[in-house]
């Protein structure tokens, strides 16, 4: 599958900072979680770690392009209800009528918007960890039957 990176938009879902205390002070490292999508049914997510934020974001974007997946979209919404669990995060996605918009919070919204879904109702249950929520959402979208 030949991809043109210019067709894709990216959204930074989360940037985290971890600190290592050493003799000379504190050493910071950054993690970035990024979602990429072309708003036409192709979506990917990736994580990156580096000593500087821009480097972490670049690594995350590169990883996101390495694991792209197709999503089945029916008009402006999804074909049917679906519930998916990944680790402690559970996500429930329901189709919505046109004009409803994306009713989603936190890390779920950028995934759905970049996939090209315009009308959907969602509920996240359990852990609100951005990484597991994004993965649960992408896996749920991948399980949709056309």
UniProtKB/Swiss-Prot annotation:
Any GO MF annotation of the entry: rRNA binding
Keywords (A to Z) from UniProt: Ribonucleoprotein, Ribosomal protein, RNA-binding, rRNA-binding
Pfam families for the chain: Ribosomal_S5 (PF00333), Ribosomal_S5_C (PF03719)
Function in brief: With S4 and S12 plays an important role in translational accuracy. Located at the back of the 30S subunit body where it stabilizes the conformation of the head with respect to the body.
Family matches, as HAMAP family: Ribosomal_uS5_B
Domain free text: The N-terminal domain interacts with the head of the 30S subunit; the C-terminal domain interacts with the body and contacts protein S4. The interaction surface between S4 and S5 is involved in control of translational fidelity.
Complex formation: Part of the 30S ribosomal subunit. Contacts proteins S4 and S8.
Protein name: Small ribosomal subunit protein uS5
